Amino acid sequence: MSQKTLFFATANVYKFEEFSRLFANHGIELEHYDVAIPEIQNIDMSIILRDKVIKAYEILSRPVLVDHSGLAMSALQELPQGLNKQFWEVLKDQVCELATKLDDRRAEMIVYLGFCDGRRIHSVYHREPGEIAYKLSSQGTFHLDRVFIPAGHTVTLSEMSSSERDKISHRLKVTEKAIEMLRSLPYGIELGLRKG
């Protein structure tokens, strides 16, 4: 592993590509570790993230970064959050219709990034306010991005260009928090984020 390379474990190549662009802006190259990490079922996304990052470290035996994203819908008392995968599998393209029927489109996109160096687990998260679109976007590869419109915008994340999305997305904001977190750790020296 080179001085400024960090492993990122995900089976989702599109997610890796987006985070890779965002970390590259800070001089960190992400190396893709293509693995589908089995997820426990829990509403609490921090518990899911902790479990995922431990499993990723056990498989890779190297410092590793993982993410977990979810949606919190106001009309559903902040659900589905950690149960997002199951929620999406059941509702598929009916998420927008559900928000219309409940007459409350407010939602937050939540994303966690976790880092394990073999000794400790560190994590950061970001909650991005917005709303559920009236109609599922036909564009994009992330199911959440196809239904979520960030506050102050009129289109879903999936309808934005990569450059536009990279300037405002929840992934950008959690990446910035992760850079600060990594900078504060001994591993930050190895990544070139601070001097020893």
Give names to the regions the model predicted.
Residues S2-F7, Y14-G196:
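Anionic-ligand binding patches
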